[in-house]
């Protein structure tokens, strides 16, 4: 998404579309379409945003999600990273919309780690990437 005024405007449009979708009680696929449509209407396909949209049913523990050009979340269980939550992948919002939704049943105590590629792509002074392995070691 970037930084500065353009990024702020992009985020404002995306968040407003998300909030309107929630008020209208839209499901996850329809919410993705609404955000994509709002970004396209405002920016004519010249700007985009990555995101993870997710919904957790607390009664059943069912997590549904879609990664719109964003790194996949990590499932943390019993103090360790169990797996990357693959599936539900699509293009960044504003570029295209493929509202594929993935699901995973969570167990009590599970945690979901959402992060940006800015974390995993960070480099040390020696040029070494921080990477996904270090991130999971840090948080698990």
Segments from the language model and where they lie:
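Conserved subregion of the PPM/PP2C metallophosphatase catalytic domain
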Residues: 1-6, 11, 15-140
